[in-house]
From Swiss-Prot:
It comes from Schizosaccharomyces pombe (strain 972 / ATCC 24843). One of its GO terms (cellular component) is membrane. This is Uncharacterized protein C553.12c. The chain crosses the membrane at residues 103-123, 136-156, 177-197, 200-220, 259-279, 299-319, 327-346, 358-378, 411-431, 450-470. PANTHER family: PTHR40467, PTHR40467:SF1.
């Protein structure tokens, strides 16, 4: 243990979750115990500074008893937002309190990045049979390369929120990230270049899945090796220790096992997340290969996809809340599942044939999930039912905060998904890459049209924003809860959520665009 460990424990996340009332290792204590296997993503001197940081206060109602602390180093290592936020907590809070800047950063930056990515003209040529083909190497390095880089960044930021890093400490995060990215492109090109598999979109999606799962395997294998060696040493040496030393060794080993168990559950959630990713891509290919669909089939698709993602969201939230005790990870994974759910439903709009179908899909998905369910679940009646069924020890104040957090995440996902859908509907219908995306061609022989899709989707977005605004007013008046204010406090307390929000948004949006491209090399 380092000399500053006791001081750090009082400064850094005394409890990782605001809604956990039992004793658990702090996130920094776990990072300290895991350090031998997985080094921390930030320099140690930035995490242990007794004079600069004040103790973390716990949430207790609409107001904090005292100002929350801010780690100026936390959002900055290797991340350009350092130059925007600076190193002062007051400046950081001021930026987040600005409605325009906050929403530009969290809800506009990711869609703009993805729209620019898919708008770049892809070099093409016609073969002797008149088939339009893509230049393979441009596609590999630029199109798939950026897609792969964002996926690796998203996985890396999740590890950072957990205060560990999957990269070898000798190489460092940046060098390892670049080398692994180049290696994944090299292996991918060798696998698909000489086979017909490269024409299949799902092949590239599978390669992306493998690229993201390898860091998880690396980190878990390192941790398992450390755990096995440490357990063997403990059992061998325990009998030789003095009674007092033996007691301390037992306590430290118990702490290590807790940290190992929590990290193992974190890995399980990552695997569930990647499973949703691969299932979503498969369902997209299945849905597109069986067009056209009736209103009934479209609604069944929406509900089946909603049920699948919601179930995975529920399981992941339960694991993160009860096993890893990380509020920040719960929030980030909720955004992933909500955005995955909504953005796939948005793309369904391009195959709806009448305004009536838009209304049915909207009632089945967005309005119900954004307004009706949040208002019902925040009531004290539902809270009491939740306590009765789950035996939760959370107070109503903490429960209300969690429900408000869920609603805020839904709003972010709604705006990001719809802004992106409207943007790439325009770009992929009128832009130079339109031949590669027949899904947005909207030929005159088809019952659906670009005009109906664009204007009906805009009307849907307006209705969602109105419903969201009314829901916020009801929460403020009847539940004494300020959605935006609590979100700002969360970001101040967990700054790493900001770059992770951006990374996960870009990754999910790219998943959808990539799944509908028509590949001919």
């Amino acid at each position: 243990m380092s000399d500053s460990f006791d001081a750090a424990a009082s400064h850094f996340h005394a409890r990782s979750s605001v809604n956990d009332s039992s004793f658990h290792l702090s996130r920094q204590e776990e990072a300290e115990l895991l350090e031998g296997a997985l080094h921390a993503p930030y320099p140690e001197e930035l995490l242990f500074d007794d004079d600069e940081y004040t103790a973390k206060t716990q949430y207790d109602g609409p107001r904090y008893a005292m100002p929350t602390m801010f780690y100026p180093n936390k959002p900055t290592p290797g991340w350009p937002l350092n130059y925007v936020f600076g190193n002062e907590r007051s400046r950081f809070e001021k930026i987040l309190s600005n409605f325009v800047l906050r929403n530009l950063m969290l809800q506009v930056l990711a869609p703009c990045f993805v729209l620019l990515w898919c708008a770049v003209p892809m070099p093409r040529y016609e073969d002797s049979q008149g088939t339009v083909r893509i230049r393979f190497w441009f596609f590999l390095i630029f199109y798939y390369g950026i897609y792969n880089a964002v996926g690796l960044l998203w996985i890396t930021k999740l590890f950072h929120i957990y205060s560990v890093n999957w990269c070898p400490s000798k190489l460092g995060g940046t060098i390892t990230y670049i080398l692994f990215w180049m290696f994944s492109l090299l292996v991918g090109s060798l696998v698909v270049y000489f086979t017909a598999w490269r024409q299949i979109t799902f092949t590239w999606i599978t390669l992306m899945f493998i690229s993201m799962i390898i860091p998880i395997g690396i980190s878990f294998s390192k941790l398992w090796k450390k755990h096995s060696r440490r357990t063997a040493q403990f059992l061998t040496q325990l009998a030789l220790l003095e009674p007092e030393v033996r007691s301390n060794a037992v306590l430290e080993t118990i702490g290590w096992k807790d940290a190992y168990a929590h990290y193992s559950w974190f890995i399980v959630v990552l695997l569930v997340t990647l499973l949703v990713y691969i299932v979503g891509e498969y369902l997209t290919n299945l849905y597109m290969s069986t067009l056209p669909h009736s209103s009934t089939v479209a609604i069944m698709y929406v509900y089946s996809w909603t049920g699948t993602v919601s179930l995975c969201n529920l399981v992941s939230s339960w694991i993160l809340n009860t096993k890893t005790h990380s509020y920040a990870l719960v929030t980030v994974f909720k955004l992933y599942f909500e955005l995955t759910l909504q953005v796939y439903v948005r793309n369904l709009y391009a195959r709806l044939e009448s305004p009536q179908q838009f209304v049915l899909v909207q009632i089945a998905s967005s309005l119900t999930m954004m307004s009706v369910i949040p208002l019902i679940t925040m009531s004290r009646t539902v809270f009491r039912l939740n306590v009765l069924m789950t035996k939760s020890m959370d107070s109503y104040v903490v429960y209300r905060k969690n429900m408000g957090r869920n609603f805020y995440v839904k709003c972010v996902a709604s705006n990001v998904s719809m802004l992106s859908f409207l943007g790439w509907s325009l770009i992929l219908h009128f832009g130079s890459n339109a031949p590669l995306y027949p899904y947005f061609s909207f030929s005159k022989e088809e019952p659906y049209s670009f005009k109906l899709t664009f204007y009906a989707s805009t009307a849907v977005w307006i209705s969602e924003m109105v419903a969201s605004y009314l829901t916020r007013l009801i929460m403020r008046k009847f539940y004494d809860f300020e959605v935006a204010l609590e979100a700002i406090r969360d970001f101040v307390e967990y700054p790493d959520m900001i770059p992770t929000f951006i990374a996960v948004s870009i990754h999910v949006l790219q998943n959808v665009v990539f799944s509908i491209i028509s590949l001919h090399f």
